[in-house]
Amino acid sequence: MKKISLKTFRKSFNLSKSKDETEFMVVQPQSLAGDFVKDDSLFGSCYGKDMASCDIGSEDEKGKNRSKSESLMGTLKRRLSAKQKTKGKGGTASTDEDTFSSASAPGGLKDVRAPRPIRSTSLRSHHYSPTPWPLRPTSSEETCIKMEMRVKALVHAASPGPVNGVRKDLRELQPRELRDLQPEPRPESRCSPSSPGDLSLHLEEHVPVVIGLMSQDYLQYTVPLDDGMCPLEGPRSCCLDTSSPMEVSAVPLPGASGAFSEDDSHVDQDLVVGPEILVDSSVNNLLIGTTGVMLQSPRGGHDDAPPLSPLLPPMQNNPIQRNFSGLSGPDLHMAESVRCHLNFDPNSAPGVARVYDSVQSSGPMVVTSLTEELKKLAKQGWYWGPITRWEAEGKLANVPDGSFLVRDSSDDRYLLSLSFRSHGKTLHTRIEHSNGRFSFYEQPDVEGHTSIVDLIEHSIRDSENGAFCYSRSRLPGSATYPVRLTNPVSRFMQVRSLQYLCRFVIRQYTRIDLIQKLPLPNKMKDYLQEKHY
């Protein structure tokens, strides 16, 4: 028997291995791969990761096994031509132009935005030159240069997103960072939010166009349910109180008062439609060409608790500790003295708490002016305090059109709301407050008043000659309601119980956190701390 030595076995293994490797002209990356990627000016970023990482010494050895009629560049041309022929059967002329070696990335716009091409090895291996070679119709060896220039243009898209992180400098991104880039999928039916040069179209938003008015001159209110626009199950005929600036609801049906609980506020948001209010240009030109009203969508959630009062705040389970760290010296002392003197608890009062926070930037005079206005407001008969919208509708049920009252807003982000009658319906709109000015619209700084009382009195004077504004739904073909404030509904016309009046006075002059220290029975303390006074 013939003995096979270990040397003979190794020689036969090397021969078989060299035969297999003659079909491929690139090998696994070696230590020279990093040097080829760094020097972009020599190779023009034309070659892929596999070509740039070839070992020169090993190529010299493999040259012995290569056929004499086939060179390295000839093999590359043959592979490129075969690849282009395969792609050309199912693609267009534009895709054929971008076809190149398998080490490059696809050139479609959809693929560039997708997560996979971002994590691909081509983006990590190619080194993009800040001044790429000019495009010109040449041989297939330079096709990869055209592809890289197109990929760079696609990556430099103007729309925001994680893909734009690649356009800063690809050489600074590590492979791990490229794997972490996950662009969110974008729907095809609309344009994503983009920079000021891009087109942004939202197909589901239908803002009506009115002759003589612009789309920004609108305010929202909810659509009345009895018109069939916003149906709810059961006998209810009122829209829920949401964060839209203008809201509409019908008069409660007899015997259906028990259905108007605060728990009903948790409904699907698609049941609430955001409408607008527009100003008649022939009566009042406050809004025409001067305001830029933002259309707000209803807020995502509602509180189970009834609305709170900025004048008589209830107890808060989790009070937020507020301080005036932005002030020092006499300003800090003045802010603290104002807060104590006004008997306000900023931790529990809705809307007022954010005003106290603004002291750090605007100074304590903002809080002082707001407090003085609220004190003047408390003396007005048409101010009813923290009543709900359902209670306001009950008080406005049997009164003529033009009747109104002012109440505390049920939204924590706002102070007050106006409830008024128009065409047999009760509408609700908020009173905006910004920098010490009040208005029914979303830009108090432009057409607002420095006093709430002045705002109401000015609206009453404008209503003497007719409606000073109109409310209308955003839905096409919806009804339009004229807005007039002619008959204030005063709370002084109703005499409440002595117990109610005592609680009203105590809550007006006693901070909520000091009620437990009063020398009163526990039952009386609990009654004083109830959310309605």
From Swiss-Prot:
Task: Indicate the segments forming the SOCS box domain, all copies.
Answer: 484-533
The pathway noted for it is: Protein modification; protein ubiquitination
What InterPro entries does UniProt report for this protein, alphabetically?
Answer: SH2 (IPR000980), SH2_dom_sf (IPR036860), SOCS6_SH2 (IPR035865), SOCS6_SOCS (IPR037345), SOCS_box (IPR001496), SOCS_box-like_dom_sf (IPR036036)
> Might you report a single GO cellular component term?
cytosol
Annotated ranges, domain SH2: 382-489
Q: Does this entry carry the keyword Repeat?
A: no
Q: Does the keyword Hydrolase apply?
A: no
The segments labelled Disordered in the record are 54-136, 177-199
From the UniProt record, give one GO term of the biological process aspect. Answer: proteasomal protein catabolic process
Skewed-composition ranges (Basic residues): 76-88
The UniProt keyword set, sorted, is: Growth regulation, SH2 domain, Signal transduction inhibitor, Ubl conjugation pathway
Output the Pfam families linked to this UniProt entry. Answer: SH2 (PF00017), SOCS_box (PF07525)
Biased segments, Basic and acidic residues type: 59-69, 177-189
Q: How does it assemble?
A: Interacts with KIT (phosphorylated). Interacts with RBCK1. Interacts with phosphorylated IRS4. Interacts with PIM3.
What's the domain remark here?
The SOCS box domain mediates the interaction with the Elongin BC complex, an adapter module in different E3 ubiquitin ligase complexes.
The job of this chain, per UniProt, is described as: SOCS family proteins form part of a classical negative feedback system that regulates cytokine signal transduction. May be a substrate recognition component of a SCF-like ECS (Elongin BC-CUL2/5-SOCS-box protein) E3 ubiquitin-protein ligase complex which mediates the ubiquitination and subsequent proteasomal degradation of target proteins. Regulates KIT degradation by ubiquitination of the tyrosine-phosphorylated receptor.
Q: Which PANTHER family does this entry report, sorted A to Z?
A: PHOSPHATIDYLINOSITOL 3-KINASE REGULATORY SUBUNIT, SUPPRESSOR OF CYTOKINE SIGNALING 6
Q: What is this protein called?
A: Suppressor of cytokine signaling 6
Q: Which organism is it from?
A: Mus musculus
